[in-house]
Amino acid sequence: MDITILGIESSCDDTSAAVIRDRTLLSNVIASQAVHQKYGGVIPELASRAHQQNIVPVVDTALKEAGVTIDKIDAIAFTRGPGLLGSLLVGVSFAKGLSISHDIPLVEVNHLQGHILSHFLDLPDRQLPHPDFPFLCLLVSGGHTQIVRVDSPLDMEIIGTTIDDAAGEAFDKCAKVMGLPYPGGPVIDRLAKEGNPKAFRLAHPHVDGYDYSFSGLKTSFLYMLRDAVADDPDFLSLIHISEPTRLGMIS
């Protein structure tokens, strides 16, 4: 028997809904929030308001693209955390209301586990390779950087994690002081592919075990950038950055 699930995600600044039938992704609709760009980061209050505006059309579109009506949904899965409290409440409240009004069971999901288990989804036109249990997963998502041992869909153990900043946070902070548009991570990734990996020397973190540390690397980058700009005020223009910089933050 095929089971059709409506998934609702609102943990940060993207409102998303998907319809899955027997591990096959039928639709996946995402509404991003451009309102945060001028602030260089996610503003929680603005994020929750945008979720309220987006969640109904996003869910409606996901159902239509999947060719499924709400009465054919067997369960509603929603993100219970981790994430921004206000954003999470929008998704949780909507999922509960939909569940009560249509008498559909609810399934709460840890969104980090959802990232890991997305490896087991298939597309309508092809089946993707699935990992065999047990396996190790490097999970890099927003405010989280972890190594997770996965023994089964419901049996996971974190064996390594960041002891300070997550990788994504370090990317975002470095992008912000360079004046890169939000989100800065993808821009840094693109610029890195065009650059010389040996051009600058940055601190290498030393952490025991399988844990990570990015705060020292971030600080090393900020000092390097400050010194480079002091030597050459046009330094940032050399790496193809045209946006106004915020170097006062690191002076």
Task: Name each region found by the language model.
Residues 2, 109-135:
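Conserved phosphate-binding catalytic cores of ATP/NTP-utilizing and phosphoryl-transfer enzymes
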Residues 15-20, 137-139, 145-149:
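Short beta-strand scaffold segments in enzyme catalytic cores
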Residues 239-251:
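Single conserved hydrophobic/aromatic residue that forms the stacking wall/gate
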Residues 5-7, 75-77, 87, 130, ...:
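Short glycine-aspartate micro-motif
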Residues 78-102, 121-122:
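Short Gly/Thr/Asp-enriched flexible loops that form oxyanion-binding sites at enzyme active sites
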Residues 72, 94-113, 118-120:
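Nucleotide and nucleotide-moiety/phosphate-recognizing core
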Residues 3, 11, 28, 131-132, ...:
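A short helix-loop
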Residues 2-82, 111, 235-238:
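N-terminal beta-alpha supersecondary unit
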